[in-house]
Amino acid sequence: MCTLDDPFFARIHTVCDRPEEMWDAVMSYKYGEDRSWADVLGRILVGFLDERREDFERYDVITTGAIYVGPRAQRLWDYLSLILDAAARQGPHWPFAPGLIAKSGPTARFLGISPQARQRIAEGELRAALSVPAPARIVGRRVLVFDDVYSEGFSLREMARVLLAAGATEVAGLVLTRRKGG
């Protein structure tokens, strides 16, 4: 549950109600670089959206959380876009639009550090690195931001902040699983 004073996002939707199993899949995909998980996770995502169509039809666009893949990046592939690309093949009726939020450079990892350290990174270097390169694509729209794991909401808050400043009317999160320290 989000305990942020001003989260900037309306709510968080969680795809999987079996967090340990989904965490294992995310770890294998993201850190083990087993890219075959992209299709599986894309199918799971579309199944979740289809089952709850009434809840998600209100969103105008579904985008990915910001990932940096340039020089000095920790990972040279956009694991969230691969999932949304797979989801778009399974559910072309959903308004998937990866990459509407840009991250201009690498930031420190959140995995394995304290919530206070994650908050400092989010409110410092992450906030400074985020932008919306094409604001016309989100102005006046309700945006759903897809990410793999939700911990305390620090990253999502910063992405919601930049989207709202660029003209989005509402921002919510959509994550595969929740895990403290994820």
Model-derived regions, located:
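Glycine-rich phosphate/pyrophosphate-handling loop used in enzymes and phosphotransfer proteins
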Residues: 1-182
